[in-house]
Amino acid sequence: MSLFDWFAARRKDQFVGKVIQEAEEADGLWGKCPECSQVVYRKDLLENANVCSNCGHHNRINSDERIKLIADQNSFKSTDKHLSPVDPLGFKDRRAYADRLRESQSSTGMKDGVTTGVCQVEQIPLALAVMDFRFMGGSMGSVVGEKITRLIEKATNQKLPLLIVCASGGARMQEGMLSLMQMAKISGALERHREAELLYMPLLTHPTTGGVTASFAMLGDLILAEPKALIGFAGRRVIEQTLREKLPDNFQTAEYLLDHGFVDKIIPRTQLKKTLGVLLRLHGYREKRK
């Protein structure tokens, strides 16, 4: 083979390799970590609970994926699946609230932004609620509040520990006061759960903000968080403009809140289930007898 033919073959191989790589990326085989820009094989990412193996960045996951990570296989039994939101105010901003609901329901396959149910974690019964940020930013409307309240009441009646996975932009403005009153309703149900001397653990994921932070996200016996999760009430820019001060770079992160006593423990996603089992046993909960 002449030198010219060798270079021609090399160029062809490089071109074909580039086409194959672009095709694989288009098919969703590869992804790029938003934190460290490392190119990762999507299958490896999924097998690692959507956590980047290079930098540990926790990518956002949906409620179904979260339940699979937490609950023992085939143990999750959903509750109140029939509840669906309505548009009591006929609210419309740039778009009608009813249209936003239909779009979110179509894209997520959910009726609203939380999945509730009872499961087992390392064979220990647990009441579990998982918010899903895909559904209108995980906002808390009347159905989200009602489903969480009913789950808390079920946990109280059945003497179950409770875990709520928070991922929310706050109260759903399109429902006005009906949304805001969910804060008090859920808090009241949690107080009755506490009076029954039962364990409640919120898990704060990225992001947990607004009315959710101002209510049930901060009422736990043990407040857990994922690494680098954004946790706060008002936005950083609003606070800086109000105080006229520059805030620390890590302000409103899980690590900042841990340092200042607002969070009890930061748990990497890959260690969550094992850690939950340990915490439940430390608080006297035992495996369900067969």
Curated annotation (Swiss-Prot):
Acetyl-CoA carboxylase is a heterohexamer composed of biotin carboxyl carrier protein (AccB), biotin carboxylase (AccC) and two subunits each of ACCase subunit alpha (AccA) and ACCase subunit beta (AccD). This is Acetyl-coenzyme A carboxylase carboxyl transferase subunit beta. It catalyses: N(6)-carboxybiotinyl-L-lysyl-[protein] + acetyl-CoA = N(6)-biotinyl-L-lysyl-[protein] + malonyl-CoA. The gene is accD. One of its GO terms (cellular component) is acetyl-CoA carboxylase complex. The keyword Metal-binding applies. GO terms for biological process: fatty acid biosynthetic process; malonyl-CoA biosynthetic process. It comes from Prochlorococcus marinus (strain MIT 9211). Pathway: Lipid metabolism; malonyl-CoA biosynthesis; malonyl-CoA from acetyl-CoA: step 1/1. NCBIfam families: accD. It is found in: Cytoplasm. One of its GO terms (molecular function) is zinc ion binding. Residues 29-290 form the CoA carboxyltransferase N-terminal domain. It comes from the Bacteria.
